[in-house]
Amino acid sequence: MIGTNVAPRHENWLQVVKSYYQLTKPRIIPLLLITTAAAMWIASEGRVDLFTLFITLIGGTLAAAAAQVMNCIYDRDIDYEMLRTRARPIPSGRVQSRHAFIFAVILAILSFSLFALFVNLLSGLLAMSGIVFYMLVYTHLLKRNSPQNIVIGGAAGSIPPLVGWAAVTGDLGWAPWILFAIIFLWTPPHFWALALMIKDDYAQVNVPMMPVVEGEESTVRQIWWYTLLMIPCTFLLVYPLGVSGAVYGGIAIILGAMFIQKAWQLKQAPFDQVLARSLFKFSIFYLMLLCTAMVIDSLPLTHQVMVALGDNLNLLLSLIPLN
């Protein structure tokens, strides 16, 4: 039986808006949009159409919000059981499940309509596939049944760069799939670091997250190996694909070294909550800066500066006597 708290009615429309806004889990969405925007800048070689960018980000926001609302509906039983999530709109009784479902459907329809009308059909279909995969594969099939839930389910969170690339080009080449792979491999270290901190919550409601099923030591070993897989993947954009250059590559090296250091520290002390929290926070910082580096590297001005620096370096080298 699914329980809810008896909450007082909303006293005004502002409280209603606040409750529905909370259903969308808004803190999760910006990171998805950053990866979308980075893909668009790379695909357009730094000359992204601002209208297309705006519509794509709005459509992506609506799609992500729809997925999160549906997730809140599905997880209302375990949200009620956990003190940390009991105050959410549905388990607290502030929003009824049927109303939340209607809200989610409206968000999804608006998202697809924006993509189909103002961008292209492929980007809209990809956005909808993210919702379907997140709900059917991650939330329904995997989350409560497999410790690999966020590994496979992480594909849903890796779709935004595909949407962004398709919005610009109308198709998908190798580069967007590398972006997909980067986020896919980034997800386990990011999410398992969080799971290490709230392991008891998941255990309380019988959700088989990796730390609950395999323990901290096994979890941090897997965090370590996924980190080692992810970092080299980030350099594939530079070589062999050549869609990003030296600026991005240099920043990726620095960020990658920092990520490896933090993952190694956690591997050495798997029960240290402070290190787990540090890795979790850094993983967010890492992805944001990596995507920012992609954008900066793609700009025509950056290319001009790098060419000028290369020419000056060649000139200096030519002045050095060979013997």
Curated annotation (Swiss-Prot):
One GO term of the biological process aspect: heme O biosynthetic process
The keyword Cell inner membrane belongs to this UniProt entry's keyword annotation: yes
Segment forming the signal sequence: none
Involved pathway(s): Porphyrin-containing compound metabolism; heme O biosynthesis; heme O from protoheme: step 1/1
Cellular localization per UniProt: Cell inner membrane
Membrane topology listed for this record: Multi-pass membrane protein
One family name in Pfam for this protein: UbiA
Keywords: Cell inner membrane, Cell membrane, Heme biosynthesis, Membrane, Transferase, Transmembrane, Transmembrane helix
Residues that span the membrane, as ranges: 28-48, 50-70, 101-121, 122-142, 150-170, 178-198, 235-255, 282-302
Family matches, as HAMAP family: CyoE_CtaB (MF_00154)
Other facts: Carbon 2 of the heme B porphyrin ring is defined according to the Fischer nomenclature.
Protein name: Protoheme IX farnesyltransferase
Source organism per UniProt: Rippkaea orientalis (strain PCC 8801 / RF-1) (Cyanothece sp. (strain PCC 8801))
